[in-house]
C-alpha cells in the first residue's frame, strides 16, 4: 500500500550560540512549538534532517542559513522515529506508531509511505544497506528489510524472547549489519544476503545495549544504558570490554557515534552531557549540553564537514559539535 503527500512549512531557526571551537555544543532552537526531535541524519550536502516524533513531521535544517522546513507525514500521528539519508539523497524514516516506512524526496518534498505487514507494528531504527531499507521492530521482536523497488518487506523473528531489537548499524570489513537487542544482554549480527542472525551474549547479564556503532576494524562499540558503561565487542574473538561512563552507573548512555577525530562520542542522558572516548588512550572528555533536560537518542556525523549533530529531545533543539578533522 502506497501513500503520497506533498506539503511543507518553512521557517527559520537561529543558533542559540555563535559558532565556537570543538567540544562545545552549539544549539539550534527549532521554531515549531513543542518540537520533539528524536533522531537526526545528515546528507552529503550538509543538510540536517530529523524526525519530530511528537508532531509527526520530518524536519530539514540548513545550517548555513538556519532555515527550517517541516514536512508533515501523510499518515497523521505516525510518530516518525528513526531516519537515514540514502546515497541517492532520499530521506527514509520509520513511522513508529503506525507501522510504516516513508521516503521523502528532498527535491520536491513529496513523501511516499509504505505500509508494513501488521506483525511489524512498531518500526524503530532504519538502515539503508545494499539497496534495501533494513529496520528493527522493538515491540514485535522482529527485524526486516524493505525492497523499495517492489515495496515488499521481508520480516525475520529474533530467536530470543523479549529481545527488543533497537539500534541498527552497518559497517566493518565484512559488511555485516549489527543490532542491539535492548531487552537482553545480547548483540546480533545480521548477514544481509539472507537475513540470518548470529547472537553475541555479553558477559554481564545486566547489560542492556541500546545503540551501537562499528569502527573500520570491525569492532562494535555500544552504549550499555542500564549499567552506565561504554561497551566494546570484538566479533573475531568474542572479547568484551567495559569502560565506565564518567557519570557513573546511573548516567544512562544512549546515542553513540564515531567522530572524524576517531573518538567514540556518546551522551549521558542522566547527566545531560556528551562524552568523547579515545580508544587509543582510553581518555574521556566530557562536554556539557547547555539546555537542561536534553536526551540525545541518536547522533549523526557529517564527515565532510567534521560535525557531530545531536537531536536534543525534550528541549525543542538540535545540537552541533565541531570535530577535529579526519585522522
Each language-model region and where it sits:
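A short helix->beta-strand "capping" segment at the edge of beta-propeller domains
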Residues: 17-34
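Beta-propeller fold detector
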Residues: 26-29, 69-73, 112-116, 154-158, ...
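Beta-rich, blade/repeat-based domains predominating
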Residues: 33-45, 76-88, 117-130, 160-174, ...
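N-terminal, post-signal-peptide region of Sec/Tat-exported proteins
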Residues: 37-70
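Conserved beta-strand positions in repeat-built beta-propeller and related beta-rich domains
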Residues: 48-54, 91-97, 134-139, 177-183, ...
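A short loop-to-beta-strand structural motif that recurs across blades of beta-propeller domains
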Residues: 57-60, 99-103, 141-145, 185-189, ...
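Short loop/turn segments that connect beta-strands within beta-propeller blades
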Residues: 62-66, 105-109, 147-151, 191-195, ...
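Blade-level signature of beta-propeller repeat domains, shared across WD40, Kelch, NHL, RCC1
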Residues: 295-327
